[in-house]
Amino acid sequence: VNAGCAAVVPGPGATEADEALCLRLMESFGRAIVIPERLMDAASATAGSSPAFVFMFIEALADGAVAAGMPRAQAYEFAAAAVAGSAQLVLETGRHPGDLKDMVCSPGGTTIEGVRALEEGAFRASVMNAISACVEKAKAL
C-alpha cells in the first residue's frame, strides 16, 4: 500500500549520491529513513513485525465493538479507519503520540476510562516487550 517505512544503512564506501539513489528507490514503496547499522534490529522489529501487532489491535478493537452489538464488518471498518487516521495524524503533525492521546481524553470521559483499562492490562509494557522479543530474536539469527 506504499505506506511502509524502510531502514537504509549506507555502507562505508557509499557516496552521498549512492545514499540519495537508495533513498529514492526505497521511498517508492513508502518512507525511508537513514539509520546507523546498530539500530537495524530495532527498525526491523518496529517496521517489519509491528503490522502483525497492529492487525491484532484492530481485531481486538473490532471484537470489543462486536461484543457491544456492532456487526463484525462494520466493526473492522471502524477499527481500521481509526488506526489509519490516528497514524496519519502522528505523521502529519509530528506531535508526540502522548499529546494526541491527551487531546482525545476528556476529563472523566469514556476515552480516559478506556486508557485506564488498557494501563491496568499493561498495554504499553506488552507492546514494548513484543518489540524487545523481536529484537532479541533478530540478534540470535
Where are these regions (language model features)?
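A short acidic, helix-capping loop that chelates divalent metal ions and anchors anionic groups
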Residues: 1-5, 43-44, 113
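Solvent-exposed alpha-helices and their adjacent loops that cap or buttress functional pockets
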Residues: 1, 24-27, 46, 93-94, ...
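Aromatic-residue-lined binding/catalytic grooves and analogous aromatic/hydrophobic interfacial grooves
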Residues: 50
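Internal alpha-helical scaffold of NAD(P)-dependent oxidoreductase catalytic cores
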Residues: 5-42, 55-92, 137, 141
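NAD(P)-dependent Rossmann-like dehydrogenase/reductase catalytic/cofactor-binding core
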Residues: 80-141
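Short pre-catalytic strand/loop immediately N-terminal to key active-site residues, enriched for Gly-Thr
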Residues: 39-45, 97-102
